[in-house]
Amino acid sequence: MNSQSNNPSKHKPKFFLTTPLYYVNAEPHIGSAYTNIAADAICRFQRLAGSEVCMLTGVDEHGGKIEKTATDRGITPQAHCDEITEKFVELWEKFNIKYDKFSRTSSEKHNKVVEHFFERVKAKGDIYQAEYKGLYCLACEDFKNERELLGGGLCPVHHTKVQEYSETNYFFALSKYSDKLIQFFKDHPDFIQPKYRLHEIQTWIDEGLKDFPISRRSVNWGVGIPKSLEETGALQ
């Protein structure tokens, strides 16, 4: 008998679930466990139902906010990330959360995958350079438009003043995929669940997709821009 036919996992339905990659700017708290508890419960059910399950969780360790926090503490960003990441791992152990893969954005594997992906997408013509001007909230690590802001140019989330930002970055050409996405969702109406989330995405596309920056020259703590481009900065 063929050995492959004796492999029970070959005939099991596959189920993959990923949690957010948790930001390690500060220590985790009880709220940090909410999503992983729900994810763990779903995966346990799927295993009982006979599925071959893979649950991924992990941490997002890059960005200007983490770099600043580490500097304020007088340690390196990597040392800060190592310390806080360990606390997340300890939290999952305390709640008996079982996961299959743990991803760290500071790992060598992650860096290589991102660089490879960047090079492939750029080779297809979907990445280009342009100047970006905008209003940036360091706490959110995100750009804001003026209609989002509170009086005095304050971030609506953190109530801190946003910074004017201008630099030449790499952009992903998201706008060129509008028609393909519209057609994809027509052909696969059940791809996004629940339905109201699909309607949100469709409205977002109908309003016009915009290309967005994927690099920051002013940030050093992140996946470096590929050396072949002979530039400094980090990918977002």
How should each PLM-predicted stretch be described?
Residues K124-S178, I182:
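Cys/His-rich short segments
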Residues N2-T57, K109-V113, H158, E164-Q236:
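Structured secondary-structure scaffolds
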Residues F95-R104, K122-L135, R147-L149, Q163-Y165, ...:
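Short secondary-structure capping/junction motifs at helix and strand boundaries
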Residues I84-D100:
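A glycine-rich helix N-cap at a beta->alpha junction
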Residues T69-D82:
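A charged helix-plus-loop insertion that forms the helical arch/lid used to bind
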